[in-house]
Amino acid sequence: MSNFLPTALKYRPTTFQQVIGHDVSKRIMINSILMDRQIKCMLVSGIRGIGKTTLGRLYAKSVNCDNFTEDVCNMCPSCVEALNGSHPDIIEIDSASNNGVDFVRELVEILRQAPLYKKRVIIFDECHMMTPQAQAALLKVLEEPPHENLSFILVTTNPVKLENTIRSRCLPIPLSQLKPAEIAQNLLNILQKEGYEADPDILHTLSIQGGGSLRDVQQMLDQLILAAGGTCKLDSKDLRAAFGILSVDEYKRLAATLNSKDIRGSINAVSDWVSDGMDLTLLYETGVPTLLRDFSVVLSGAYTDKISLYSGLSADLIKNRLQLSLKDVKVFFEIWENVFPMLKGANRPEVVWQLFLVRLFQD
């Protein structure tokens, strides 16, 4: 039987040092332990797949670690039980399934017992799924904890759905989206450990597809490896086969043809991609809007190091060679809006692309 583990599980951090980004949040958790200032309740929030539950588990493991300095040791009996998922004092609850008031009341009875190790930590995953009655019962527990060596970690993608009275009793730990560069470096590290190679532009392209979610991108990496088969070198063809999206180099090729209004070059580029299995619907849905957005960012003077160019084009390349104006981009976008509906249900989508180019360059 296969021992395959998805990348997101295989490379899930087991120490604070392994967690990508979230430096301030990690420092708050670490300092609370070093300074012996127990956090009775924290609210960890953010989009899916950025490490909310992972950080909650690490904090729970840390407060019970026998050798904690700046990080967990992963060697003491408490850490070993936590790694095995059998720690008696770390209770993780799926609030989507256990969201009723009766469950919270039953939990309170369990919490009255003293922890076997140092602290008992309760992690409520997706806590916003709890019913109003369950939240009211939880509030009473937060106000009057049944035991002093007790901490609660509320994890959610939607904190506004929690009652204000609960939020007011929590230390907020908001997690931001991860930067594409951070995600790309993580993918590179994983590929090196797994014995794969990939062009940097492919890693950059993948890293921006997940919208800042590391788990989503790691799942895409698994799909990309499967699409590549036994090949150890991942290239742009694998990217198109798996997702129908363009790599950075292909964005550059498309940008050059749009910038110079080269209809032949645009048609040839798309013909090459279609022959490699690209879904033109995705090109319309993501490729063209992405480029138009990046053109607008640079032409408007809004580009800074903090604003990513989703296509992966460098600002200098666009500034030096961009012949378009903001008015041109506006016209391009209006034509794209008019032509895009024609693509759905089209028997020959490449003809719709050619129509788009003709209208684009004639105007």
Model features per residue range: what roles?
Residues 1-178, 182, 188-190, 200-201, ...:
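P-loop/Walker A NTP-binding region and its immediately flanking N-terminal helices
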